[in-house]
């Protein structure tokens, strides 16, 4: 499919979608930064994906609050034998079940991730176990606080970047060799517990692993008249998998604020 996409894939005129592509990253030979970001958004992850993930917000003294979620994806875009006309502008369907802490357990989020989110915005619903109520979540996008992140991440930071790219101007800065997290088998060992990983200011570096790796570098600058907590972002994208490996997020004064 990569060869077929290379010959036929095109950005829509506004850059908020693609056409003549299916199943995997559309632009194996990208010409600009926006094509690289679409390669990340549409990278191949199979037809279905299920996993359990933990997130934590460490305090200065080393204590932390942990949230555990179960994620279940169905990738309409990557289904064998499908085409763009069949998927009804959907990339994937996602159900997230919160397992812990007990105060949040039972919370369920359902997302229909759309391809062109300007034409048809992301659809999201959230079931609150405490009130036993199901509500639409129309603002689950852009700079809105990512649920259960203690306001440390925006929604569009999930998976390093997601959603419509229309708030930024994207520039491809070329390729660079940098040290990035890669093949950190110790960190992902099933016997490793959160207490083994989490430290007051960063993860336990005895478990981390880094490689000198060639990446695409993409810079995103906030468009005039748009409001977002990040005025500039730099993305380092794996040239093999198109997974964003690291990012830098800058505040309104163009000072480095966060890294992911």
Residue ranges and their predicted role:
Residues 1, 31, 90, 95, ...:
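Context-gated lysine
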């Amino acid at each position: 499919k990569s060869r077929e996409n290379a010959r036929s894939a095109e950005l829509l005129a506004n850059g908020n979608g693609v056409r003549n592509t299916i199943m995997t990253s559309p632009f194996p030979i990208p010409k600009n930064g926006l094509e690289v970001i679409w390669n990340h958004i549409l990278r191949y992850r199979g037809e279905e994906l299920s996993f359990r993930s933990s997130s934590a917000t460490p305090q200065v003294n080393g204590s932390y609050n942990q949230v555990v979620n179960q994620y279940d994806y169905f990738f309409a875009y990557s289904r064998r034998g499908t085409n763009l006309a069949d998927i009804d502008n959907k990339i994937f369907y996602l159900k997230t079940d919160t397992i812990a802490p007990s105060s949040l357990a039972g919370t369920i989020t359902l997302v229909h991730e759309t391809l062109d989110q300007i034409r048809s915005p992301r659809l999201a619903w959230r079931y609150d176990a405490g009130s036993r109520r199901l509500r639409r979540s129309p603002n689950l996008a852009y700079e809105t606080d990512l649920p259960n992140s203690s306001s440390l991440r925006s929604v569009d930071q999930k998976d390093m970047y997601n959603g419509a790219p229309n708030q930024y101007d994207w520039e491809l800065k070329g390729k660079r060799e940098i040290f990035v997290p890669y093949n950190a088998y110790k960190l992902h060992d099933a016997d490793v517990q959160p207490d083994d990983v989490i430290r007051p200011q960063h993860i336990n570096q005895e478990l981390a692993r880094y490689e000198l790796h060639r990446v695409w570098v993409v810079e995103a600058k906030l468009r005039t008249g748009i409001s977002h907590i990040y005025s500039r972002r730099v993305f380092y994208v794996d040239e093999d998998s198109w997974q964003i490996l690291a990012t830098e997020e800058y505040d309104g004064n163009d000072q480095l604020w966060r890294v992911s």
